[in-house]
Amino acid sequence: RDAECARYAGLLQRYPVDIVCMGIGENGHIAFNDPDVADFNDPKLVKVVALDPVCRQQQVNEQCFERLDLVPSEALTLTVPALLRGRWLFCIVPFASKAEAVRCTLYGEISEHCPASVLRNEADACLYLTAESARLLPAE
């Protein structure tokens, strides 16, 4: 695992990413940076993380896996700093189940408790929402 993280990080160093397409998880995660493991100042580009129960259940809810016992308990993920190195950040967020995470992203404290909140610091980040995922946002 460490060797694969190092290999992947080397590729990211050698071939910098211009466009990052990501989503926001039900717990506010970006990539697999769940609230318990997200680090806005992580020195690594890629790391192995333990997936929290909310994230694992989301994989089943979104039909990525048939059952919870089939969802891995660990994953390789780009770290928050690695994601933010992209020149353009596009975040696509469907589903009503993510409405609270979207609200926290846009109106909550910028902190690792809602990793997606860091996107508010990025001038080139674009958030694409559905009516369902935006349902808890104030009307403008």
Describe the residue ranges of each PLM region:
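Conserved phosphate- and dinucleotide-binding cores of soluble alpha/beta proteins
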Residues: 1-140
